[in-house]
């Protein structure tokens, strides 16, 4: 079905799908599973690698040799773009919103290691930087390069179609595992992943609610972005995505103290997933989605007998940029023995939720 699209194979697919029995038991959920798009590889994996297969395929088809994209200082998308560009033999230019730090850590360090050319914009957020792409592309063309502009999050129709293909992959795995989730929970910001999943849900006849937990701004703003992408997908790829009326479900209750700000709920969610399942979340996206899963389960908003799938979108390298906050939280928790005791006693690991 998706073979008609240009594609440069990068990801290690299919990504694993497996149950989270320990976390499910702690939260009172009988059937909790996880889809591991943190394991797409290369570049430490993440959801953008799927998108970049189609984005780079399109860029190469157009004869481009340079990827230009935007993001925040600890952008997972930019890190994956830098890695994918290296693997595809292309140059990479990153426009990052924020002040250049004295020390590079986390994703920013990896951007540099992958050879990306980085430009910092101290007074701009990452989404407004999309408006700078055209002028940067013009400058690079004047230098003799053939640049390809990639908006934040690779949130384009062709990038989003990667997640329609991901739903096809998931449906095959669900059939083999005899698992039928009633809901799929996924973090969202720029909206490309969620738009693709909703399109794929329609294309594949997947009978599951897809809930995007917004980590960036209001549910209304996020819904507008997702709706716009879906309309563009229907318009630009009518042979793949027929016209339909999408059900866009976005919840903005779990943003916490703001985008890329890690508070106590995010720390606790990261610790719960790590100590009960050996799964690492990130502070910016999946940490907040994890908070949403935990709070909805504990409040009864997710019924105990309702099969639920948590879609992990990656982002763990950002943990190293938050090492001080995470270390302080661990130190407050006490000794290793005390922490082991805490995670073994019923109810203790959910304190604070």
Annotated model-derived regions:
Residues 1-353:
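PLP-dependent amino-acid enzyme catalytic core
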């Amino acid at each position: 079905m998706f073979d008609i699209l240009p594609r440069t194979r990068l990801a290690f697919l299919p990504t694993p799908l497996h149950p989270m029995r320990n976390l499910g038991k702690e939260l009172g959920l009988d059937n909790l599973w996880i889809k591991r798009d943190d394991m797409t590889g290369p570049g430490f994996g993440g959801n953008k690698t799927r998108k970049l297969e189609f984005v780079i395929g399109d860029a190469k088809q157009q004869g481009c040799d340079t990827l230009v994209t935007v993001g925040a200082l600890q952008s997972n998308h930019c890190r994956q773009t830098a890695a994918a560009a290296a693997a595809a033999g292309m140059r990479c230019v990153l426009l990052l919103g924020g002040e250049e730090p004295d020390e590079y850590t986390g994703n920013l360090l990896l951007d540099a290691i992958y050879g990306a050319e980085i430009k910092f914009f101290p007074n701009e957020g990452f989404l407004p930087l999309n408006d700078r792409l055209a002028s940067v592309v013009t400058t690079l063309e004047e230098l003799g390069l053939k640049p390809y502009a990639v908006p934040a999050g690779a949130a384009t129709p062709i990038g989003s179609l990667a997640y329609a293909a991901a739903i096809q992959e998931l449906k095959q795995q669900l059939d083999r595992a005899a698992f039928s989730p009633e809901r799929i929970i996924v973090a969202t910001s720029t909206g490309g992943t969620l738009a693709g999943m909703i399109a794929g849900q329609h294309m594949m006849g997947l009978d599951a609610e897809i809930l995007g937990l917004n980590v960036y701004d209001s549910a209304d703003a996020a819904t507008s972005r997702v709706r716009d992408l879906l309309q563009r997908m229907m318009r630009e790829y009518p042979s793949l995505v027929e016209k339909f009326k999408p059900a866009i479900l976005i919840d903005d209750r779990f943003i916490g103290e703001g985008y890329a700000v890690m508070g106590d709920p995010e720390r606790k969610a990261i610790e719960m997933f790590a100590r009960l399942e050996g799964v690492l979340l990130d502070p910016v996206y999946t940490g907040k989605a994890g908070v949403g899963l935990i709070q909805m389960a504990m409040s009864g908003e997710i019924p105990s007998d309702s099969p639920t799938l948590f879609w992990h979108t990656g982002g763990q390298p950002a943990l190293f940029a938050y090492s001080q906050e995470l270390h302080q939280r661990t130190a407050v928790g006490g000794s290793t023995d005390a922490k082991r005791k805490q995670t073994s006693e019923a109810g203790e690991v959910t304190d604070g939720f």
